[in-house]
Amino acid sequence: MKSVVTTVISAADAAGRFPSTSDLESVQGSIQRAAARLEAAEKLANNIDAVAKEAYNAAIKKYPYLNNAGEANSTDTFKAKCARDIKHYLRLIQYSLVVGGTGPLDEWGIAGQREVYRSLGLPTAPYVEALSYARNRGCSPRDLSPQALTEYNALLDYAINSLS
């Protein structure tokens, strides 16, 4: 799994050199932000069911046609799968907060997702809406410290951009 530390070391190793000062500063910055990332990961873990449910509801509110017969959210099974996928993305964001990099999102959430959704005839816009809702819902200091919210939002933006 990729983290800032493994990415920096791998890049330096591939170039046949020791990590540079700027490489080490990047690692140091990541370590300094670790407390904020862990705060965000803990809050998300404690509230993931509520956040996922609200995000799912926001997506369906914006795209009500998905509940029509034959659409991607027309049966209870499809609804459960959509809600599951949203929660899965949030869980991957939580894992990414813990490791301090996008590795979990890249490896388990983004790789091949467009092709899978396209082959199944599933629109990605509702997922984008759900993650956007989760991003816009967060508030500092009500929910998280400013730095924790910044770390959380950065990963949500990353996931949103990958689905867009």
From Swiss-Prot:
The keyword Cell cycle does not apply. This is C-phycoerythrin alpha chain. GO terms for cellular component: phycobilisome; plasma membrane-derived thylakoid membrane. It is a peripheral membrane protein. Light-harvesting photosynthetic bile pigment-protein from the phycobiliprotein complex. (2R,3E)-phycoerythrobilin 2 binds at residue 139. Keywords: Antenna complex, Bile pigment, Chromophore, Electron transport, Membrane, Photosynthesis, Phycobilisome, Thylakoid, Transport. Heterodimer of an alpha and a beta chain. It comes from Pseudanabaena tenuis (strain PCC 7409). (2R,3E)-phycoerythrobilin 1 binds at residue 82. Pfam families: Phycobilisome (PF00502).
